[in-house]
């Protein structure tokens, strides 16, 4: 399923295999299609044929609400529904549920919350999350967990960790049962456990030690990039990494900037996802190999250059900065689509170049050159 083929320090070059799409080269960035589509008018066809995407990520909570996981199941699963034949990871819905802080009630069984669409009450626990993700037929299901608020009181974070551990045990049991059913959508679906513990290193380490005893197919670090300083995020990764099984993939959830990804790889992380490339693109903020630019700025009005002269994405091969700026100022939907395509391609190319640097034994030099540069504004 997962094999580390080369290392440089803690950075790992690996190959991940799952039911759909054959081999995935890691480190990898997963493109976020929350409701089985990338916001900004980007389809699975774009991901596959134009953007170099390896894995797509969809949202359990949103797909449960609409069209309904039962609808997706009747359509043959998420792969057939959205016409994507590569790997799909579905998150458990926990992050979205727990972000509805004023609308939810937590118990040992799970969480009762109000739909953000129409306010009707919904219950979701470990078993419900596993059943929804089984209906979706994703390649990787994420365990149901609680993502605590930042900052969180120590005692609450500790109790939450303990409950999330018990929930993982229930997830594992239900996941195994569902995979064994004769009519399951994807009998090869994998399960990743999630490390929690807020910003408390001792809780993080304890929790990682406990969930590592449960035989999951991979392990994620969750509950970061929720308002804590970047340095604290890196400290938590450094604290947890030694306790993560070396033979399983490691996933840093919801992170992040290009610099975050480079620094995450340097700390032993294999999988990343973030809404940032698509979200920033929809506001005209574009990533380049010299830093980020705001295409709405007046200085690009007569600029004949592509977004990034170093980029060979479909957008940079065809269109100028001046044209992109015009589309945004005219509020044409095409501007958003082209911007999203460029940013997703950039993120996919970033992880490709990280892999190449690991293959060639020069990741440290790549990190030195780009970790700070990509955070600059131009």
Each predicted region: which residue ranges?
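C-terminal extensions of enzymes
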Residues: 1-17, 24-33, 40-41, 145-151, ...
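Non-catalytic, usually N-terminal nucleic-acid engagement modules in DNA/RNA processing proteins
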Residues: 1-185, 298-301
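Conserved, mostly hydrophobic/aromatic
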Residues: 22, 56, 91, 133, ...
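Short secondary-structure capping/turn micro-motifs that flank functional sites
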Residues: 64, 149-150, 227-228, 280-281, ...
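A non-catalytic, amphipathic alpha-helix used as a structural packing/dimerization or gating element
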Residues: 128, 132, 136, 159-170, ...
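Structural signal for hydrophobic packing residues in well-ordered secondary-structure cores
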Residues: 137, 168, 172-175, 179, ...
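Glycine- and acidic
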Residues: 150-153, 158, 218-224, 333-336
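Glycine-rich phosphate/ribose-binding loops and adjacent secondary-structure elements
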Residues: 162-165, 174, 178, 186-307
């Amino acid at each position: 399923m997962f094999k580390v083929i080369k290392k440089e320090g803690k950075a790992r070059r690996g190959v991940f295999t799952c039911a759909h799409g054959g081999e995935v080269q890691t480190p990898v960035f997963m493109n976020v299609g929350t409701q089985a589509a990338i916001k900004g008018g980007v389809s699975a066809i774009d991901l596959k044929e134009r953007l170099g995407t390896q894995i797509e990520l969809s949202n359990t909570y949103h797909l449960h609400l609409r069209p309904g996981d039962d609808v997706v199941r009747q359509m043959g699963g998420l792969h057939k529904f959205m016409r994507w034949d590569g790997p799909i990871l579905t998150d458990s819905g926990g992050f979205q549920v727990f972000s509805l802080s004023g609308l939810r009630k937590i118990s040992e069984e799970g969480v009762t919350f109000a739909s953000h669409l129409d306010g009707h009450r919904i219950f979701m626990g470990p078993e419900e999350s596993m059943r929804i993700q089984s209906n979706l037929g994703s390649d990787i299901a994420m365990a149901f967990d609680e993502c605590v608020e930042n900052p969180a009181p120590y005692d609450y974070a500790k109790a939450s960790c303990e409950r999330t551990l018990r929930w993982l045990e229930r997830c594992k049991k239900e996941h195994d049962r569902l995979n064994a059913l004769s009519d399951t959508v994807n009998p090869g679906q994998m399960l990743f456990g999630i490390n929690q513990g807020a910003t408390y290193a001792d809780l993080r380490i304890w929790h990682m030690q406990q969930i590592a005893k449960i035989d999951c197919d991979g392990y994620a670090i969750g509950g970061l990039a929720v308002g804590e300083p970047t340095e604290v995020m890196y400290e938590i990764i450094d604290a947890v990494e030694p306790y993560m099984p070396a033979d399983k993939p490691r996933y840093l959830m919801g992170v992040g900037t290009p610099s975050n990804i480079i620094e995450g790889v340097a700390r032993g992380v294999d999988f990343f996802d973030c809404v940032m490339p698509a979200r920033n693109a929809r506001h005209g903020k574009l990533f380049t190999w010299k830093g980020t630019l705001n295409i709405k700025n007046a200085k690009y009005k007569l600029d004949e250059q592509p977004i990034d002269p170093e980029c060979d994405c479909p957008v940079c091969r065809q269109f100028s900065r001046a044209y992109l700026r015009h589309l945004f100022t005219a509020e044409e939907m095409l501007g958003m689509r082209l911007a999203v395509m460029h940013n997703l391609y950039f993120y996919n190319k970033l992880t490709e170049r990280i892999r190449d640097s690991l293959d060639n034994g020069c990741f440290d030099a790549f990190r030195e050159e780009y970790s700070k540069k990509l955070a600059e504004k131009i």
